[in-house]
């Protein structure tokens, strides 16, 4: 292993540890999401895992997913740009968000086993803006070589963690079923 490979591996492992969230169900409505234990948004890993779950729903039920994303973003809400960005990213790659669920790989067409599990982790820089209320978590994709970021913001008055920005919809390896070279 080369020196830089070792450094990259150390950075990817994280300084503060990792958190695994087992989702008992994939929410299909805002009411269902809010009723889930994770729906209180009191832990940053819960908000991150629910973001993945909601993005998985988007190709099937766009309006319900947008309502849930509005909730996950809290006071910030979704802008017109955010909605257009989501629509553009999901044109032909609805499998991307499923790649963040444990066990989803190109070989199984990003069909993860149940129960659905999301693991997030911190790196040495995750808490650089914690004094301002921001925390950056990382999530591995079964179809990418490097983890993706999700940035959360804490609302001190309620203790809730809201989605601030996500970089989860970048391109990944296509599923075997869609890969002409497989």
PLM-predicted stretches and their roles:
Residues 2, 140-181:
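Short beta-strand edge/turn micro-motifs at domain boundaries
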Residues 83-143:
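Surface-exposed, charged secondary-structure patches
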Residues 61-64, 68, 103, 113-114, ...:
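Generic detector of ordered, mature protein regions
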Residues 50-56, 117-119, 136-138, 149-151, ...:
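Ordered hydrophobic segments in well-structured contexts
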Residues 10-104:
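Core segments of small alpha/beta cavity-forming domains
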Residues 1-8:
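Amphipathic, hydrophobic N-terminal targeting peptides for secretion and organelle import
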Residues 27, 37, 59, 75, ...:
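Proline-rich intrinsically disordered, low-complexity coils
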């Amino acid at each position: 292993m080369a020196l830089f490979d070792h450094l990259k591996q150390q950075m990817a492992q994280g300084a503060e540890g990792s958190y695994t969230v087992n989702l008992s169900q994939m929410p299909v409505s805002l009411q269902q999401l809010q009723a889930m234990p994770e729906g209180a948004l009191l832990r940053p890993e819960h908000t991150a895992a629910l973001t993945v779950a909601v993005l998985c729903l988007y190709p099937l039920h766009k309006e319900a997913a947008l309502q849930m994303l509005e909730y996950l973003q809290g006071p910030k809400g979704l802008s017109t740009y955010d909605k257009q960005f989501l629509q553009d990213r999901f044109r032909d790659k609805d499998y991307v968000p499923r790649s963040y669920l444990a066990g989803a790989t190109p070989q199984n067409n990003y069909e993860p086993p149940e129960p659905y599990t999301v693991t997030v982790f911190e790196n040495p820089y995750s808490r650089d803006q914690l004094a301002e209320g921001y925390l950056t978590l990382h999530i591995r994709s079964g179809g990418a070589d490097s983890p993706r970021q999700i940035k959360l913001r804490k609302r001190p008055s309620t203790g809730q963690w809201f989605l601030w920005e996500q970089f989860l919809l970048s391109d990944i390896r296509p599923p075997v079923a869609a890969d002409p070279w497989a």
